[in-house]
């Protein structure tokens, strides 16, 4: 597959420019690699190829994307359907892309997640567990839940802020040095009708699984969503998907904010990093070269460390998240699963999760 070059000067002067591109003027979702600046081809690699893996009659590919070494699979959360049908975990084999579904005990409405080293785990090995943001429902608190997919066991790590009920925990990352869990709390369970009305602000938190300390590290969001550390761990990126609540409102945030990480514990110097031109930036990951990738309204957008849009993995529909694997990135757009292969870029956590590419 060749890259499609976007003429930024033509786009600057003609708001209908995209309608002239065959790659974007489509009636059904299809994948293309849109290069906004020549650097994008170097990020993905000149030999990168893209294709659709599968198209299912239900929204199996929504959030998460956590690697489990024992079965060489990614664990992806499905989209919410009803209170009678808990959110499923979709298991994608990286051997042949076969798809299965499972559920874990005491995990009710899973959303974002990450690989997890519990206290005392051997960090010279790949992470033995996964941790999910459980949005909860009317009968269960929203929680951070640790899961061992190999033994089908789970443990609630945190289900309140010092006794106050969270709204709908959305996404989480583990700091690779301290082991702390950094996570966001949004209102989407309430907007989707399976959580009570929120009772506290929408914020970013830091939790120490070793001590039980939980701390608010950032507020002032409409809907804090995805979060990710830069490769050097000096910056935390947080997406605000406030443009989407009961419906889409383009005058509200569809924004990525950047913060300085201070002493691995707190945040400072909040600033606007990027704004999504289509939809809103949801799940977010960094690569080892400092580029910032986010799922958005028409696929995955890629910015350099200065916030310049380099290009898009365009699929023509909303993507909520994606996952890096060695030499590839899998893109989740609810009922459809896409892949870019022969990928040059390496995700920040690929070395930790897969034990591959650690020499970079």
Placement of each model-derived feature along the sequence:
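Beta-strand-rich domains and repeat architectures in extracellular enzymes and scaffolds
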Residues: 2-87
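Surface-exposed loop and turn segments in beta-propeller and other repeat-based domains
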Residues: 16, 27-54, 100-109, 154-167, ...
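Beta-rich, blade/repeat-based domains predominating
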Residues: 56-71, 106-135, 161-181, 188-189, ...
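Extended, compositionally biased flexible segments
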Residues: 79-135, 139-149
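A short loop-to-beta-strand structural motif that recurs across blades of beta-propeller domains
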Residues: 87-90, 142-145, 202-205, 255-257, ...
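Short loop/turn segments immediately following beta-strands, especially the blade-tip
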Residues: 92, 150, 258-266, 342-349
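Flexible "stalk/tail and boundary" regions
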Residues: 94-95, 206-210, 301-314, 321-329, ...
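Blade-level signature of beta-propeller repeat domains, shared across WD40, Kelch, NHL, RCC1
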Residues: 321-360
